[in-house]
């Protein structure tokens, strides 16, 4: 067999490539949004873990009223023996801080694994998008060259 026989050529229309690029762009946008949400969740868990550490070391705790810190409460007289930890969905459990730390660390580990997978998928999708964009750019350059020769 000659080298030419080993190479397979695939013919794809420009319309199909454009449709693929559009679908891939939407998928990339979805992955980027998911990535940002996962990072935000991990940062929230880190904040909760830090709050649990502070709880054990202080008489007074500052509690942020919202994500942006528009209002902060000074809280005293907290029962340091029990905290409520989110288990998932709408379920919370009253547990000791050490168990809450374990739950949060497990959650963080799971989210970090998902984040890693999303990051890999995002990299593959961006590479595929770049390849399609390169093909489309080459096709556009060839078309312009043909128009310049003819016109």
Swiss-Prot record:
Organism for this UniProt entry: Sulfurisphaera tokodaii (strain DSM 16993 / JCM 10545 / NBRC 100140 / 7) (Sulfolobus tokodaii)
First-listed, main subcellular location of the protein, grouped into a coarse class: cytoplasm
Oligomer and partners: Heterohexamer of two alpha and four beta subunits.
Keyword hit for Cytoplasm: yes
Pfam families cross-referenced by the UniProt entry: Prefoldin
Protein name as catalogued: Prefoldin subunit alpha
Known role: Molecular chaperone capable of stabilizing a range of proteins. Seems to fulfill an ATP-independent, HSP70-like function in archaeal de novo protein folding.
Biological processes, Gene Ontology terms: protein folding
Annotated compartments: Cytoplasm
GO terms under cellular component: cytoplasm; prefoldin complex
